[in-house]
């Protein structure tokens, strides 16, 4: 987690430096002798995972208000008074990790963590916190309240999962009789009205003709996801053959999605283990019978999930890294 601290007094600055020594991050001083708060907040909202204000809560609220977008996008925001008595998560308590961060910071300076989210206050299962713990993206953040609201009202909720989830489900959480009856689902292929939690375990294997533009790759990728009902939020990186290292369109496409690229030689691709779609033409050009499937499997160190798909000179495939979800959702659970 990338943290950024700001304080407004000498006492607050000393506390910020103490906190940063335990939870590393940059430290700035705001006010007449320091950075401009509006500029600092805008910059850190764009580049940091967590913003920590050491000062009045009202200062933090006014500073962050223009930048708040959604549960899924906003960084964690925590405020501590300059005396280090209280640590209050203001924004992104679960998905952004502000609740956990507030507790960590409170432990450093012996403050009281002030956690105000209803599920935490009542000890009720928090589906968004569980998603974060399992390294899942939340496809529809607006549906979180439906699951949490039902549990807070004393009702049960049903889940579906495409993987076995180890351990005992939390109180009030039961397996759905059918996938289309689930209130929330752990899946890479979301359908229906459930809250979908998308494991970040997928690697996109890419093959393309020389000179393929980012726009053409984007169009192909959108069609690929639509045809397979695949959630793009599950992709964590992309992979291809080293012959594509200098393709500007491929680089721009991956950069737009925030994916790093892995490139493999033909010899390395031939070592991949799975059942692959073989092409004599691809073999004659690249020295290996398949690029997208083999590259995805190697980069994921896992198994092929969606086999080779081709359109307009673009080939795509998806492989999955090993994934073993469990029902732990609190940091103090073993």
Where are these regions (language model features)?
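Long, charged alpha-helical interface segments
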Residues: 148-175, 274-296, 300-310, 319
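Conserved mixed alpha/beta catalytic, RNA-binding, or beta-rich assembly cores of soluble enzyme
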Residues: 12-18, 25, 34-36, 44-50, ...
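Conserved beta-strand termini and adjacent loop/short-helix elements that scaffold enzyme active sites
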Residues: 29-32, 116-118, 264-266, 307
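Terminal alpha-helical anchor/extension segments at protein ends
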Residues: 203-207, 220, 288-334
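Conserved acetyl-CoA-binding loop-helix of GNAT-fold acetyltransferases
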Residues: 41
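C-terminal non-catalytic interaction/assembly regions of soluble proteins
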Residues: 237, 241-294, 300-304, 311-314
